[in-house]
Amino acid sequence: MAQFFKAAPTNSIKNHILKNIKVEKLDHRGRGLAYFQNKPLFIDGALAGELLEVQIVESKKRYSKGKIKKIIKASELRITAACPHYQECGGCDLQHLNQAAQIQIKSDGLLSLFQRFAKKVPQQLEKPIIDKAWEYRRTARFGLQFDKKNKQLKMGLRRAQSNELIDQKVCPVLLPELECLIPPLKILLNSLQCKAHLGHVELLYADQGAVVLLRHMKTLTSPDLQLITAFSALQKVNFFGQASSNQSVCLAGEANLSYRLPEWDCSLSFTPTDFLQVNSDINKKMVSQAMQWLALEKNDSVLDLFCGLGNFTLPIARQVESVVGIEGVQQMVDRATANAQLNNLQNARFYQADLSGENLIEQEWANQNFNKVLLDPARAGALDCLAFIAQKKPSHILYVSCDPLTLARDSQVLLDKGYKLDKLGLLDMFPQTAHMESMALFTG
């Protein structure tokens, strides 16, 4: 059979330098938007109104991407980034703006997406939920790369759009209790006999203090364990190891971890591999706002989808007659059930279900009458379970989202089913980045 090959285009503009490019506005991801050859040109780190010299790094049929080579005319909003790694690190992308400007960009982006994907858009957003702009992250994962030539282990976040690690020295968005561990942790990891067989290291913070989780592909030796024990005692951290399985093992320090939601007198146990909201202060405010927007009453029966450890479920249980939490992973269901027992909440029950499946109505819990629903899905959204939710005809549907694009898309479905978008608001869960958390209330 004859084979035909299409020659690569000879007019590719990749790596070309463009001068006097004017940025028109920012998109919902905080990227500068300009136009070149009648198609969008997205520029990381650019601000509206700026005049730039830009290098094309990617050219597609419908759009191009560029990076700033020189700022010819800077925006009045541009500030100097606080982190010395900002120009090379892929972790943050809005440090060149103050917090108020970041909030405005995210708010504008959220409204813009709803204007594109939803029929009815609120005239304005609810007051945004904000807190500290720095020193807020209670979780972080650092990559580890072993250099065979110099026998050294590099620890750091990845460069933007790259698998290469930076040589991390500081990270000012981390809680101070975690950031201060970066230098001594690098020394420890480079002292281990198994340093050529490490995957990544995670830092997190619990009520029991700082936690280190080390992913290792080779069994830790006795000398390695001794070094880890000494490090744990000196730095006052809880140290966990994770081999090939997903199970983590406490190597030194406190094995039982938890965090509190004091407003509702709830304590939630977790393991280092469980999902946690990265911003503890915003998380507490988020739970509080969710409870207010749902207008919970004592006789309510609430369904909490994508419930995780019970971050929303347990506080809700303090206010209502009954609440059912649904999660896709059985281990998380077991953890949430244990958390309900720990908090002496008899009116909270948890079940495992594939929330992307089509047979939700056949589940044993699905025949209950729920008058209010809360859902907090991953970035992919909750498109597959919206028909089931609407079928239950709840008076309130509260949707918490970490991706405004899928929230706007899913909102269209609920609006088409007769629900009204009653409230829409931004939660600044991730300052210094373009990522946003948002909350929408639908009533019917």
From Swiss-Prot:
Keyword Nucleus recorded: no
GO BP annotations, alphabetical order: rRNA base methylation
Molecular functions per Gene Ontology: 4 iron, 4 sulfur cluster binding; iron ion binding; RNA binding; rRNA (uridine-C5-)-methyltransferase activity
Catalytic activity, EC: 2.1.1.190
Domain TRAM: 11-70
Reaction(s) catalysed by this chain's protein: uridine(1939) in 23S rRNA + S-adenosyl-L-methionine = 5-methyluridine(1939) in 23S rRNA + S-adenosyl-L-homocysteine + H(+)
Enzyme active site: C402
Pfam families assigned to the protein according to its UniProt record, in alphabetical order: TRAM, tRNA_U5-meth_tr
Family matches, as InterPro entries: 23S_rRNA_MeTrfase_RlmD, MeTrfase_TrmA_AS, MeTrfase_TrmA_CS, NA-bd_OB-fold, SAM-dependent_MTases_sf, TRAM_dom, U5_MeTrfase_fam
Residues reported to bind S-adenosyl-L-methionine: Q277, F306, N311, E327, D354, D376
Binding site for [4Fe-4S] cluster: C83, C89, C92, C171
Keyword terms, alphabetized: 4Fe-4S, Iron, Iron-sulfur, Metal-binding, Methyltransferase, rRNA processing, S-adenosyl-L-methionine, Transferase
Function: Catalyzes the formation of 5-methyl-uridine at position 1939 (m5U1939) in 23S rRNA.
UniProt-listed HAMAP family: 23SrRNA_methyltr_RlmD (MF_01010)
Family as reported in the entry's similarity comment: Belongs to the class I-like SAM-binding methyltransferase superfamily. RNA M5U methyltransferase family. RlmD subfamily.
UniProt-listed NCBIfam families: PRK13168.1, rumA
Record-given protein name: 23S rRNA (uracil(1939)-C(5))-methyltransferase RlmD
Organism per entry: Psychromonas ingrahamii (strain DSM 17664 / CCUG 51855 / 37)
This protein's encoding gene: rlmD
